Amino acid sequence: MSSVFRKILVTCALPYANGSIHIGHMLEHIQADIWVRYHRMRGHEVWFVSADDAHGTAIMLKAQDLEISPNKLIKNIRIEHQIDFSNFKISHDNYYSTHSLENLYLSRKIFTCLNEKGLIKEKKIFQLYDTVKKIFLPDRFIKGTCPICKSKNQYGDNCEICSATYEPTDLINPISVISGKKPILKNTKHLYFDLPSFTNMLKKWIHSGVLEESVIKKTEEWFKVGLKSWAISRDAPYFGFKIPNYPNKYFYVWLDAPIGYISAFKNLCFKSKKLNFNELWNQNSNYELYHFIGKDIIYFHTLFWPAILEAVSFRQPSGIFVHGHLTMNGLKLSKSRGALIKASDWIQYFDSDSLRYYYASKLSNKTHDIEINLEDFIQKINSDIVNKLVNLAARNASFINKYFNGYLSDKLSNIKLYKYFVNTSSSIEDFFENREFSFIVKESMRLLDVANQYINEKKPWKIKRTEENIRELQNICTMGINLFRIIMIFLKPIVPDLAIKTESFLISKLTWDGIKKPLLSHQINKFFPLYKRIDVEKMFEFMNICR
């Protein structure tokens, strides 16, 4: 166990409940899950929650298209999402929904608090209205040219190219996504949260160590142009929570969605007797709170969300970890853009560890985009996992099983080399803590090269099976098995399925404390295939369904 015991809550951004989980969603959940699994291995108390973002016009319209109720739609989608996350071994303690009694209660309670403090203002505005569908258009149902960078085909709330936020009415040449027609401006009233009054607090908070430097710079750009009051209401028809005392007004999804982090934890408290809701969310909490998000929602999490928490005297996040977009052939994979690879399709062709490992090999604590290339993917999995990692175990286990009835020696053939591997754990720990997962993969592969080189130099297959030499053979192969074991301990949070198979093969749990304690005079199982090589033909089959 790590020397200082920590209590941690981790969240991922909430997938929208109008469609399938794609491998872009999975990037974030895998990143968070690796971090969570590592800290659990170190003996910390770690809770991991997320939820479906289950409100909005898009859900209402999707349900209408399917001729089912919105409630039925979000129920079906949540089940599908839970299956997808389970297939990729995402270890949520609670995967909830924003359409819940807890979220209704907390959204109304927080709104009432904001209103009583004079932080909610009602304004008359002009809003884009679809005369064909007779509906006020939400941000994501309007496309046009970004008023800042002039990029075309951008949504009505923020630009995916320059990350600017703006009002839908600021778009140049707006078009309704629903009808394809140009909307008109229509008068309505909306409720606004007084975000500008938190400018000084937010300027101080973003420099408190919670954000990576590039995220700070991005956030500072919004201070330069000045923060604007934030609309938190939407007009009927809408699927969501009604705002008390405001007929035909509903909470905007960006109010009740982040509150979903809190409600998912509140629901978890009902399920677990170990947890106390107020212990985590009070301003003096000794829990750590981390949000994993994509760079397209930085504004909401570094400005709007901390201002809301400050206003209602809830604790602030300890860190907001931002990743880049997932791209293929240079294009962002996005459900809203209609360019995606569904997680359920992926798992029909490849196992979950393969994607987890591939993502880990590219992930850092920076916001750079991650390019997925299927040829590179197959080469990396077959080379790293099959040829290097599993082969190290196989070539040593064959001798241990054949000549020693599965028993490892009572000594290692090279104590100095074993200690060298053990000493690398300190840098691996730093890499995990700082989410530099690509460095963990690189270091593990470097160690594998060292281990395989050691076995190649010793050439156990050439050692004569005499009474004099048989002991040396056992010591060498015991050394090889133990070096494999250390590397698998390092990789356990990344490839949990392979870790389970390895534990079965070794008849020993892979624990962080076990790094310093080699397996000696210990019987292992007969070796069995731990990982299957990926067939190139599978890649071509998969590429066909992705077109």
UniProtKB/Swiss-Prot annotation:
GO terms for molecular function: ATP binding; metal ion binding; methionine-tRNA ligase activity. A motif ('HIGH' region) lies at residues 15-25. It comes from the Bacteria. One of its GO terms (biological process) is methionyl-tRNA aminoacylation. InterPro entries: aa-tRNA-synth_I_CS (IPR001412), Anticodon_Met (IPR041872), Met-tRNA_ligase_1 (IPR023458), Met-tRNA_synth (IPR014758), Methionyl/Leucyl_tRNA_Synth (IPR015413), MetRS_core (IPR033911), MetRS_Zn (IPR029038), Rossmann-like_a/b/a_fold (IPR014729). Its EC number is 6.1.1.10. Its cofactor is Zn(2+). A motif ('KMSKS' region) lies at residues 332-336. Zn(2+) binds at residues 146, 149, 159, 162. The keyword Cytoplasm applies. One of its GO terms (cellular component) is cytosol. Binds 1 zinc ion per subunit. Belongs to the class-I aminoacyl-tRNA synthetase family. MetG type 1 subfamily. Monomer. This is Methionine--tRNA ligase. The gene is metG.
